[in-house]
């Protein structure tokens, strides 16, 4: 037997490095061909992988211990709910249940009130004749097709509002525009209210021109995530209401009263990649009691008086947001618990306070975090009802 002296690797000069017979050369060349094919197959497998999927896997492993800073958004799966709604067993809504399609107010009201209907598809523009009560239900999704809109034209105290969610759990609201008739301080109703609801995910929606507010959360509601959602006022406010404010473009109230001490330990809410856009005056949001995480959001309402307002026993973490052309990005009110404003926030052409006070809570979840430099472009392009339907995975 001859002894062989192999170089590391196999190349076209393989037989120069070894002494071998013609048969051995044939054997080696067969091996070389198979080896090359194997390498090519492996290389093609790697290049055919979605690079986003690869980075997502790596990021998810790392995010077990820390949030990740990334420059663009990612697409995940429905089971990977971001923020507080991922806790307490998670939020799945109606899952893969059979759809009930609605195009009229009567159909929408019937589907919402029917507890056996778990997945509602809204198409077109539906104008509500009266506010709809969504009460005492579990495991339901309501979503819109492209351009779907639910509208109220009623500015009265008792007749305003679009949908009132009460005592419900495991709910998903996605890709819908909720449009009110314009702000009017009559102590009326919000476009949408969550009252004592748990595990709710509001994703890729737009709330505009609510009478009292755009979207409020109160009364022991808990484990809520609001993602890629836009808040705006496009209609001029109406003055002269019984409530006393001539401009009540107050978008989002968290906790209804300083005296609602039953809210202690609840109102755990994440606002991630949301946009408080043109027309918002105050309450972006205004918080009592809750542990609220505001991350990667964009504030650019030029008519603002104040943006984030930390009220009684509010505990707020403000992380990697962009404030642009607004007044008082952070209002510290009497009796707050803590507001942490991280170094990742960007303030451009703002006036008023930008500092926090005390040390806010640490979220028990990990969430993919955009670099502040990517927030404006990502949110202005993606926030709102920008999907074609019930498409999952904002992050």
Question: Where in this protein do the model-derived segments appear?
Answer:
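Acidic Gly/Asp/Thr-rich repetitive segments characteristic of extracellular carbohydrate-active
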Residues: 80-121
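Bacterial Sec-dependent N-terminal signal peptides
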Residues: 31-33, 45-73
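Extracellular beta-rich repeat passengers
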Residues: 286-395
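Glycine-rich beta-solenoid repeat tracts in large extracellular/virion proteins
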Residues: 132-136, 161-167, 184-185, 190-196, ...
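Extracellular beta-strand-rich solenoid/capping regions of secreted or surface-exposed proteins
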Residues: 109-116, 126-141, 150-173, 180-198
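Bacterial N-terminal signal peptides
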Residues: 38-45
């Amino acid at each position: 037997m001859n002894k062989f002296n192999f170089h590391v690797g196999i190349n076209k000069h393989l037989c120069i490095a070894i002494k071998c017979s013609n048969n051995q050369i044939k054997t080696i060349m067969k091996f070389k061909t198979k080896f090359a094919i194997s390498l090519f197959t492996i290389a093609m497998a790697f290049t055919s992988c979605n690079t986003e999927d690869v980075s997502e896997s790596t990021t998810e492993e790392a995010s077990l211990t820390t949030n990740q800073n990334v420059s663009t958004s990612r697409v995940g799966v429905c089971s990977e709910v971001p923020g507080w709604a991922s806790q307490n067993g998670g939020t799945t809504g109606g899952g893969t249940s059979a759809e009930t399609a609605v195009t009229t107010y009567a159909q929408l009201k019937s589907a919402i009130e029917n507890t056996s209907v778990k997945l509602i598809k809204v198409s077109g523009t539906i104008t509500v004749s009266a506010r709809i009560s969504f009460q005492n239900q579990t495991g339901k999704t309501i979503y819109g097709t492209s351009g779907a809109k639910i509208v109220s034209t009623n500015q009265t105290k008792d007749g305003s509002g679009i949908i009132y969610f009460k005592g419900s759990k495991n709910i998903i609201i996605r890709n819908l525009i909720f449009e009110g008739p314009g702000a009017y301080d009559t102590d009326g109703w919000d476009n949408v209210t969550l009252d004592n609801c748990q595990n709710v995910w509001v994703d890729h929606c737009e709330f505009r021109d609510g009478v009292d507010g755009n979207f409020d959360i109160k009364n022991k509601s808990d484990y809520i995530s609001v993602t890629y959602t836009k808040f705006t006022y496009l209609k001029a406010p109406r003055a002269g209401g019984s409530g006393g404010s001539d401009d009540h473009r107050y978008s989002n109230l968290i906790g209804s009263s300083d005296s609602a001490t039953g809210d202690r330990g609840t109102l755990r809410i994440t606002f991630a990649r949301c946009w408080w856009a043109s027309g918002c005056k105050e309450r972006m949001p205004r918080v009592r009691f809750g542990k609220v995480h505001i991350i990667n959001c964009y504030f650019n309402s030029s008519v603002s008086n104040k943006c984030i307002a930390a009220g009684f026993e509010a505990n707020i973490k403000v992380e990697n947001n962009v404030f642009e052309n607004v007044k008082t990005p952070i209002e510290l009110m009497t009796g707050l618990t803590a507001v942490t404003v991280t170094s990742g926030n960007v303030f451009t052409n703002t006036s008023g306070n930008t500092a926090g006070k005390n040390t806010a809570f640490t979220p028990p979840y990990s969430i993919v975090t955009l670099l502040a430099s990517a927030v404006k472009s990502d949110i202005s392009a993606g926030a709102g009802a920008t999907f074609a339907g019930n498409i999952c995975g904002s992050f």
